Design a protein with these regions (language model features):
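N-terminal targeting/docking segments
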Residues: 2-3, 22
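Bacterial N-terminal signal peptides that target proteins for export
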Residues: 3-14
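Tandem repeat scaffolds
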Residues: 26-171
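Bacterial N-terminal signal peptides
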Residues: 13-23
Length: 171
């Protein structure tokens, strides 16, 4: 049982302000430099040049990287569930063992990307360019490859290589 005592009216605005500030999420981590295990959850990183950064085991859930440059980025074991990489350049990025469930890669460039054992369940790869990417052991359950370029992609079994001209499905 909680008892609330009457608060003098002069303290009421201060209490309301304290309650509002306590209820807002902390975004200070969004200014943290790129580093392994960085916490960029829900951060807006649209258009940033993050070429070659190490985001190993990074917390990237719900973050936005629209039109960002992440070529050669190391994102091994990162959690990017529900993140948005629309039109981002991830050429040669290493996302081995990454959690990419429901992540949106619409029109992203993932040429030569390593998505080995990545969890891509229900990911959106609409019109993405995955030329030469490695999907060995990846979970693609419910993933949308509509219009995706899959030339030379190493498929989930680690053996099959998609033929030139593969769009939407591995031929």
């Amino acid at each position: 049982v909680f008892y609330i005592r009457e608060v003098p009216h002069r303290h009421l605005p201060l209490l309301i302000l304290a309650a509002l500030l306590g209820a807002t999420p902390a975004f200070a981590a969004c200014t943290a430099p790129a580093a392994p295990e960085v916490n960029w959850r829900r951060c807006l990183l649209d258009g940033r040049d993050l070429t070659g950064v190490d985001l190993t085991r990074g917390h990237l859930r719900d973050a936005s990287f629209q039109r960002a440059r992440l070529g050669q980025a190391v994102m091994i074991g990162a959690d990017a569930t529900d993140a948005r990489f629309l039109s981002a350049d991830l050429t040669g990025a290493d996302m081995t063992d990454a959690n990419l469930r429901e992540t949106d890669f619409t029109r992203a460039t993932l040429r030569e990307a390593r998505l080995i054992r990545a969890d891509l369940r229900r990911a959106r790869l609409f019109r993405a360019d995955l030329t030469g990417a490695d999907l060995t052991g990846a979970d693609l359950t419910g993933a949308d490859f509509n219009g995706a370029i899959l030339d030379g992609v190493r498929w989930t079994d680690g053996e099959r290589i998609c033929a030139a001209g593969s769009v939407g499905t591995c031929q």
